[in-house]
Amino acid sequence: MQNQLLINGELVNGEGEKQPVYNPATGEVLLEIAEASAAQVDAAVRAADRAFSEWGHTTPKARAECLLKLADVIEEHAETFARLESQNCGKPLHCVISDEIPAVVDVFRFFAGAARCLNGLAAGEYLEGHTSMIRRDPVGVVASIAPWNYPLMMAAWKLAPALAAGNCVVIKPSEITPLTALKLAELAKDIFPAGVLNVLFGRGKTVGDPLTGHEKVRMVSLTGSIATGEHIISHTASSIKRTHMELGGKAPVIVFDDADIDAVVEGVRTFGFYNAGQDCTAACRIYAQKGIYPQLVEKLGAAVATLKTGAPEDESTELGPLSSAAHLERVCKAVDEAKALGHVNVVTGGKKVEGGGYFFEPTLLAGAKQEDAIVQREVFGPVVSMTEFDDEEQVLAWANDSQYGLASSVWTQDVGRAHRMSARLQYGCTWVNTHFMLVSEMPHGGMKLSGYGKDMSVYGLEDYTVIRHVMIKH
């Protein structure tokens, strides 16, 4: 397994403390990797800063060609990436191969094209005797912090727009799941000029803090928890760095009486539990209207109970383990607290799976109330709550009564209602009669404490640029 860092175009061993990397399906140590030292963090940022003077002025075509080469290389090594991701995250291998790797490749190819299609206000004489034009230039050195739930995909979401726009990047994957990012570093080394892309390994306090706080870093992009986002915003405030934050969610799934109940059941079974529920857009907070609620509890409970947990390499496995022992304990605690309330009914699941690895049973909790922590706080596991509602106004108020604002869905056959709800839900994305669908052409990002800034789409590309006005007197 590739365990070296990429700094200034060279693969080097970390000079810091060694950290274990686990297989969450077994709890066994896969390998130990040495963190970047403080000197190596500094070297990576300064290499990126030096490279920016040239990379930032390359043509969009040249940058696009590099991204297309990287996409091709990932596609050629798809099985290697999939196996690393499966081993390091516990994801079912067939899901990584069929869903995640193609999506990663598509993101790089999309931004390769988007780099050549930026547009803006037309140049013109908005003041007599003066011609104005708008430039959209790269920001500079971007520090990117990727999460542990989709390590390779989130790295792609950060690298592709930043590099396409002409920035240079120093990326730190999660210390829990670094293997695919380090493999990516090995393959990208000969595609990009030295210093354009740098990949580090280490914990937040030893590598993340000196990276995000570095004087030469002009922008920090994070996908992570609210707590981590708060820390980075505070840590970088004195240097007024641009920040780009995607900080989690608690997606409401609003099911009206006229919804296609079978479609809802299939949707929640799939999109509430994909990646063991470790997804900030997971369909985890169901509000069902009183007419459909009892039947939905029964049907969904039966469907969720059929989800198969198991070894990631088994093609019949649908639900892998949680990412770490610590996260398994957090999920156990959240469910135990809900059960202790008395009014929450465990329809199915509700406890960890005995044996090796960090597995938790697919869980459906009915009877949850709006004020319950299981409704209000992100669990980030295979746990879905159900709450009964009366009418449109009540459920709209409840859905928006959340610190999160990333994703939501509405299930109804009434087109007018779908439009009304979509217009008033305070979420970065609202799906109607589906959930979890993402495409490279459309933006993904949150509101409220779910953060700000967009991933994917031309809006994501624009987030990694600065707008400049040039006026010429004549």
From Swiss-Prot:
Example GO biological process: L-lysine catabolic process
Pfam family, one: Aldedh
Catalytic activity: 4-aminobutanal + NAD(+) + H2O = 4-aminobutanoate + NADH + 2 H(+); 5-aminopentanal + NAD(+) + H2O = 5-aminopentanoate + NADH + 2 H(+)
GO molecular function, one term: aminobutyraldehyde dehydrogenase (NAD+) activity
Keyword Signal in record: no
Binding residues annotated for NAD(+), in chain numbering: A146, P147, W148, K172, P173, S174, E175, D209, S225, I226, A227, T228, C280
Record-annotated disulphide pairs: none
InterPro entries membership: Ald_DH/histidinol_DH, Ald_DH_C, Ald_DH_CS_GLU, Ald_DH_N, Aldehyde_DH_dom, Aminobutyraldehyde_DH, PatD
Membrane-spanning segments: none
Active-site residues annotated for this sequence: E246, C280 (nucleophile)
Domain of life (superkingdom): Bacteria
EC number(s) from the headed UniProt entry: 1.2.1.19, 1.2.1.-
Enzyme class: oxidoreductase
Annotated CDD domains: ALDH_ABALDH-YdcW (cd07092)
Keywords in alphabetical order: NAD, Oxidoreductase
Biochemical pathway: Amine and polyamine degradation; putrescine degradation; 4-aminobutanoate from 4-aminobutanal: step 1/1; Amino-acid degradation
Family, as annotated: Belongs to the aldehyde dehydrogenase family. Gamma-aminobutyraldehyde dehydrogenase subfamily.
NCBIfam families, sorted: ABALDH, PRK13473.1
Biological function: Catalyzes the oxidation 4-aminobutanal (gamma-aminobutyraldehyde) to 4-aminobutanoate (gamma-aminobutyrate or GABA). This is the second step in one of two pathways for putrescine degradation, where putrescine is converted into 4-aminobutanoate via 4-aminobutanal. Also functions as a 5-aminopentanal dehydrogenase in a a L-lysine degradation pathway to succinate that proceeds via cadaverine, glutarate and L-2-hydroxyglutarate.
PANTHER family tied to this protein: ALDEHYDE DEHYDROGENASE-RELATED (PTHR11699)
Miscellaneous comment text of the record: 4-aminobutanal can spontaneously cyclize to 1-pyrroline, and 5-aminopentanal to 1-piperideine.
Subunit and interaction comment: Homotetramer.
Protein name: Gamma-aminobutyraldehyde dehydrogenase
Organism: Enterobacter sp. (strain 638)
Gene name in the database record: patD
